[in-house]
Amino acid sequence: MSRFFLFFLQLLALIVLVFSCQEEFIPATVAGPHPLVVEGYIEAAGERSSPPYVFLTRSFPFFSQISGEEFDDFYVHDAEITVSDGEEEYLLTELCFNDLTPDQREIAANFLGRNLDSLGINLCVYLDLSLSLFGEEGKTYTLSVEAEGETLTAVTTIPEQVSLDSVYFVEPPGEPRDTLAQLRVILDDPPEDNWYRYFVRVGDDAFRRDNFSVFDDRLFADERLEFPLNRPLAPGESFDLSTFGLFRRGTDMSLKFLFIDEAHHRFWETIEFAASNQGPFSNYTRIATNIEGGLGIWGGIAASYYERRVPDL
């Protein structure tokens, strides 16, 4: 038996010993209490600015199996949720999908960018039904949640946004594909730190995010940058390398480009990293949050919308 082979066996035995002696890592959310989860936003987008809305749910244990019956108890009801802009405080009202008329359901689906009928659950959201508060750039908003004996708070600021210089389509790189086009944008990045996110809608579909929808300007601060944006895969669409990220010519495209703050960026960055880091050898990822007393995100958004028809190039 060669010395190299003996060394290899010794090394392998050492690796097995080291890993077998490691203490099992159990995330705190498995053994401890299960905090409430907030997903809330307020958006500044000119005439398309939106009032605040908040989803309030219960968290599940990390290794739990979730059944349809448990989803009936997923949403937290009868919470007192307020949003303050530093001058006034606004009370949000709970509204559930099953309580809406068909016309109201369609409006809610378009507003939230979700096909609510396909979810199979009674989605509930807290809204400013008075439409008294809309997002404004540069303003700070404080969220307060009182539910099930718990108090949750969070603060977000809507950044000042800069419009994209150009939004256009080009021939895809690589082999010729006369039915497809690539979306590209030009951004003049402001000198301060900036964090971005984007959504895309094709035709009358809902706005959808790419698997890597957030990015920052650490590598191109205060520069003029041209870069592509992918078309997200539609639900049920299989991955095809030859068409991935590309748009079919002759279709209508809407781009929603977001300026967000650092905490908002960090939340989605960890969400998307966890989603892409799956498999038997993946690591447990702790999702970032700006919610004091709970989990989730309270995010301010400065958004610009761009409508384009994919041309025949």
Regions found by a protein language model. Give the residues of each.
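C-terminal motif of bacterial Sec signal peptides marking the signal peptidase cleavage site
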Residues: 17-20
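A sequence/structural signal for flexible, mid-protein segments enriched
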Residues: 22-313
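Generic hydrophobic-segment detector
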Residues: 10-11, 30
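Bacterial N-terminal signal peptides that target proteins for export
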Residues: 1-9
